[in-house]
């Protein structure tokens, strides 16, 4: 369901530098670090507006694309919307004692595989001969304009794998768009809030699923380990991805592996809720998605963060693909007009505050968090709910949604947070 499932870049598409011309000393309008959703989406949007005579996409190949997928809802006007192989026009949501199936119009819920994104990228940048994808690792950047606060360009150091070892090259770039954090100091992984998920790709012996409807959140699953929900994305009447996700709060011990109870709960859901009497498992998707509450990385000179580093993954849901598209389009528009892309990232302080408030409720009072999600999903039309979750709702629409929600859990969680901060004292 969620967006951030790392998979390997297809070796047939990003070519190794040895198969083309030498890179050392070359100059690029942009170097894009990372070939996942953020990097490839940005390349597509740059090509779409006709910006850049030389753009280099560098991916280390350690995170495969083959089994990766992204999901989002959109009205169909996006650059990559037509590349999605799945588009559902209805949404199912459920909880203890209630079940709702609603039309998504004017939205559709779309799912795009890594292979589809890679193919769409090749198609869109195909006419831009200066756009190149290589396998390599960006080791660092030397930003000439960082101290001055402008973009004077960068020298980018790249390690390129070759049959007999690694070749290091330096290239020049007017802009560097970073989705991985090439110049970030490694720090111990903190126990941040995150989503812990396991999904089973199943094929049933009989018709079980409705290919036109996605089950976005079904809370009819065990809640003892934290707020949990089921998700179903059908690909036919007999096949689907059936996934279980748990919110893991900040401060909880990070697991060494995905909770083994997930699979038992998925199997129970298949049989007890969906009525699947016989099925076989054709694949698994497992992982965690950080629900980042810290401020996003900021642009420094010519180095511009993109993707999750730029705050494009929504902290309360883990969705980010549509936000990445909007950011990529904004960057491309700035560059096409001769403006700096440093301010292209939207500032959503209000929505970040709402996300943090909801995460506090999830951590302090999971039962009330379930109630809040149930109210949002069951008492509001899909258009209002999805626009709100997409941070695209009008003030009037937001107020109407808030009027349906219980406010006491938010107030209680806020008071607890303030009390904790006072007890801990000022941060060093």
Give the ranges of each region predicted by the language model.
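A conserved beta-strand/loop capping segment in the N-terminal third of enzymes
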Residues: 72-145, 153-154
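A conserved FAD-binding loop/helix module that cradles the flavin
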Residues: 309-330
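Flavin-binding catalytic cores
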Residues: 252-285, 304, 325-348
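N-terminal FAD cofactor-binding segment of flavoenzymes
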Residues: 41, 45-97
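Predominantly flavin-linked oxidoreductase catalytic cores and closely associated redox partners
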Residues: 45, 124, 128-279, 292-295
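FAD-binding beta-loop-beta segment adjacent to the flavin cofactor pocket
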Residues: 224-227, 287-306, 311, 361-367, ...
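N-terminal Rossmann-like FAD-binding beta1-loop-alpha1 element of flavoenzymes
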Residues: 18-56
């Amino acid at each position: 369901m969620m967006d951030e499932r790392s998979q390997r870049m297809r070796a047939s598409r990003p070519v190794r530098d040895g198969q083309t011309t030498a890179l050392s000393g070359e100059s690029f309008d942009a170097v894009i670090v990372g070939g996942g959703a953020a990097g490839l989406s940005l390349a597509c949007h740059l090509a779409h507006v006709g910006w850049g005579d030389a753009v280099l996409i560098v991916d280390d190949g350690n995170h495969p694309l083959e089994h990766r997928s992204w999901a989002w809802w959109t009205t169909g006007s996006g650059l990559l919307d037509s590349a999605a192989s799945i588009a559902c026009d209805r949404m199912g949501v459920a909880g203890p004692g209630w079940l709702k199936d609603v039309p998504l119009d004017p939205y559709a819920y779309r799912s795009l595989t890594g292979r589809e994104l890679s193919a769409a990228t090749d198609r869109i940048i195909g006419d831009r001969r200066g756009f190149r994808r290589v396998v390599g690792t960006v080791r660092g950047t030397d930003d000439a304009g960082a101290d001055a606060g402008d973009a004077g360009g960068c020298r980018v150091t790249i390690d390129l794998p070759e049959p007999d070892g690694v070749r290091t090259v330096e290239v020049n770039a007017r802009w560097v768009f970073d989705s991985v954090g090439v110049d970030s100091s490694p720090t111990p992984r903190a126990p941040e809030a995150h989503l812990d998920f396991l999904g089973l790709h199943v094929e049933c012996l009989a018709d079980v699923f409705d290919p036109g409807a996605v089950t976005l959140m079904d809370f009819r699953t065990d809640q003892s380990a934290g707020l949990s929900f089921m998700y179903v994305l059908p690909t036919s009447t007999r096949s689907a991805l059936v996934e279980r996700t748990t919110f893991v709060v900040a401060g909880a011990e990070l697991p060494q592996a995905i909770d083994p109870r997930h699979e038992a709960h998925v199997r129970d859901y298949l049989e007890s809720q969906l009525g699947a009497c016989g099925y076989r498992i054709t694949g698994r998707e497992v992982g965690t998605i950080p629900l980042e509450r810290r401020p996003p990385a900021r642009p420094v000179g010519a180095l511009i963060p993109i993707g999750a580093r730029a705050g494009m993954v929504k902290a309360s849901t883990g969705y980010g693909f549509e936000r990445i598209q909007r950011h990529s389009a904004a960057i491309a528009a700035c560059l096409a007009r001769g403006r700096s892309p440093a301010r292209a990232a939207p500032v959503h302080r209000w929505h970040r505050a709402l996300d943090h408030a909801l995460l506090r409720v999830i951590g302090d009072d999971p039962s009330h968090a379930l109630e809040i999600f149930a109210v949002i999903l069951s008492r509001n039309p899909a258009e209002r709910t999805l626009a709100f979750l997409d941070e695209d709702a009008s003030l009037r629409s937001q107020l109407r949604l808030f009027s349906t929600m219980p406010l006491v859990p938010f107030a209680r969680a806020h008071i607890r947070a303030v009390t904790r901060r006072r007890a801990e004292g000022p941060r060093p």
